[in-house]
């Protein structure tokens, strides 16, 4: 099951556009206290910087919704919590805030683990609830894939 993959590792989340949805999915699983350490909802740029150590220059040059910010969020969450893995999301849930380059539903996610940080860009729909649900599911799948990849020694 889903929980079995996660329970062998300690986990943390750093969420922006998903607003704690990933953390909520972890805590809904029985036995979560054994592996889920911390969930940070860093919605503002200031909180991304102050809580997770995201470089304000990166936000200024790349935008909060960018691969680099997702990477720094995940790495920051892993660093501050000591978790084996941290998963991060930053995106545009809508209905406002989209641009031609980054339309509503654009979500960058990242997983920082013991050996590497991986990132993924997904288009998660146009409805706010749908974006949150899909981004959470994609991020959890990315996390699961990374844990399994490491377990297989790849």
Give, region by region, the residue ranges found by the protein language model.
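Glycine-rich phosphate-binding loop
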Residues: 1
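Short alpha-helical segments enriched in small residues
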Residues: 4-154
């Amino acid at each position: 099951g889903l929980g079995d993959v996660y329970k062998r590792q300690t986990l943390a989340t750093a969420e922006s556009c998903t607003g704690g949805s990933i953390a909520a999915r972890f805590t809904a699983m029985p036995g979560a206290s054994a592996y889920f350490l911390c969930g940070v909802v860093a919605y503002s740029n200031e909180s991304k910087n102050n809580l997770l150590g995201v470089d304000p220059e990166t936000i200024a040059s790349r935008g909060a919704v960018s691969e680099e910010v997702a990477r720094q969020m995940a790495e920051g969450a892993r660093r501050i919590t000591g978790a084996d893995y941290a998963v991060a999301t930053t995106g545009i849930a809508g209905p406002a805030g989209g641009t031609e380059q980054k339309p509503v539903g654009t979500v960058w996610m990242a997983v920082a683990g013991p050996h590497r940080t991986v990132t993924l860009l997904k288009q998660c729909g146009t409805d706010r609830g749908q974006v949150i649900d899909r981004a959470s599911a994609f991020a959890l799948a990315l996390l699961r894939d990374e844990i399994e990849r490491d377990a297989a020694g790849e």
